[in-house]
Amino acid sequence: MRSSYLQSLFAVRVYLICGALLIMAGSLFAASGIYTFTLNSIDGKPAPLADYKGKVILVVNVASQCGYTPQYSALESIYEKYKDKGFVILGFPANNFGHQEPGTNEEIKTFCTRKYSVTFPIYSKISVKEPDQAPLYTYLTKETAPGIQGEIKWNFTKFLVDRNGNVVQRFEPAVTPDSKEMVAAIEKQLK
């Protein structure tokens, strides 16, 4: 009888320890999330996303010849409004949709700063679709929560990342950066 009790007690302890280890492993992965990626800045220098640890991040695939390109103004506006509260926008130029980002990195940088006075970080041009999809976008589209996953369908798809590096929400291109929906989501993460 005593041996049966000890075996049961041992089994319970093993289950509890395994459960705790799984929770810790999940937390460790979630804590690293987006921070594990390093891409190049628009100037071609390595720019680790870990530099933004502790900030709320909006990741956006951008293009300079798209019907949604005027969203640069609203992106810059919300960046200016919230940057001192720990918010940053990261723009990733991509030429995957209708060849609407054909320029070089230098041309993209000039366009963004002259036409829209962009001050938030813009990265070097990448691909957001397969077969040459950047690892960051593989993560965003395949390794996040089911409501967030899915192929990028067009320019200016946005991903909101919490202060721990976890992707918490996705906004399709038609959702403007200054919309009530997006502003509320950003403010919720900044609290």
Residue ranges and their predicted role:
Residues M1-A11:
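N-terminal secretory signal peptides that target proteins for export/translocation
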Residues R13-S27:
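Bacterial N-terminal signal peptides
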Residues L28-A50, A134-P135:
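N-terminal "domain-start" segment that seeds a small globular fold
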Residues S41, N61-Q65:
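Amphipathic alpha-helical repeat scaffolds
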Residues Y68-Q133:
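Structural microenvironment flanking redox-active thiols in thiol-disulfide oxidoreductases
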Residues P135-T138, K142-K191:
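Thiol-/selenol-based redox modules, centered on thioredoxin-like
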